[in-house]
């Protein structure tokens, strides 16, 4: 049965596409409100090189910006761009008052230090939420820009469980700076009891079996099956893995979807779960950047 048919027959499947569309509609209304007050939200996207996947991601981001009414500026550079040249471009965008958000598409060519580049972006324009000031601010519970994927995951959880997540035990599988660590911090902010497991954790399966919420972000295809899950858990699958089946490539998550589905109360599919939320929350973060730069509104 196709995923579309499964979603019609199973309320357990969290429809990330539909929820992301709702987020985009919210953003669209807010953009109109800002424009009525003379502020045109603007996102600058920087792409270095010609990586095909990066080009697709940039195109999708620009299209979604156009849909919600956010002005986008694209800056494309050859793969041999020097780090100093890229930093100079970021400095220009930092000082440009009409630019509210800056996104540097990763990965960058090997001659460029990603950490130095991301740290150069002004924290209030850092729509990816990767700057150390924003990372620290999140851990302190301050109103800062947070990474798009885990922030989108919180919205998916609230759509399934309601706005109050307090007291629930959440297990985050993976400790990356992009998803795992900020996911744990955001869940703590929601007053969940949070456990982070990773490659060095003993008895991962037993730990996961205690969880009301499981967020899988480890990058291993179908690693989590029903034996890891307790009945009625809510599962958010952040993984995107390409595997070969019957001489065809298909996308799967970190969770064995078909095995887990009968066990859980709700689960995100791959594709069509977390992925659409990431770009939707990039648009949401661009508006958050506008608010931070124009606190009087």
UniProtKB/Swiss-Prot annotation:
Catalytic activity: (6R)-5,10-methylene-5,6,7,8-tetrahydrofolate + NADP(+) = (6R)-5,10-methenyltetrahydrofolate + NADPH; (6R)-5,10-methenyltetrahydrofolate + H2O = (6R)-10-formyltetrahydrofolate + H(+)
CDD domains per UniProt: NAD_bind_m-THF_DH_Cyclohyd
GO biological process, any: purine nucleotide biosynthetic process
GO molecular function: methenyltetrahydrofolate cyclohydrolase activity; methylenetetrahydrofolate dehydrogenase (NADP+) activity
Claim: Oxidoreductase is one of the keywords in the record: yes
Pathway the protein takes part in: One-carbon metabolism; tetrahydrofolate interconversion
EC number(s) given by UniProt: 1.5.1.5, 3.5.4.9
Keywords associated with the record: Amino-acid biosynthesis, Histidine biosynthesis, Hydrolase, Methionine biosynthesis, Multifunctional enzyme, NADP, One-carbon metabolism, Oxidoreductase, Purine biosynthesis
Binding site for NADP(+): 174-176, 199, 240
Intrachain disulfide bonds: none
Xref: SUPFAM superfamilies: Aminoacid dehydrogenase-like, N-terminal domain, NAD(P)-binding Rossmann-fold domains
Signal peptide: none
GO cellular component: cytosol
One Pfam entry name: THF_DHG_CYH
HAMAP family per the UniProt record, alphabetical: THF_DHG_CYH (MF_01576)
Subunit structure: Homodimer.
Family: Belongs to the tetrahydrofolate dehydrogenase/cyclohydrolase family.
Physiological role: Catalyzes the oxidation of 5,10-methylenetetrahydrofolate to 5,10-methenyltetrahydrofolate and then the hydrolysis of 5,10-methenyltetrahydrofolate to 10-formyltetrahydrofolate.
Listed name of the protein: Bifunctional protein FolD 1
Organism: Acinetobacter baylyi (strain ATCC 33305 / BD413 / ADP1)
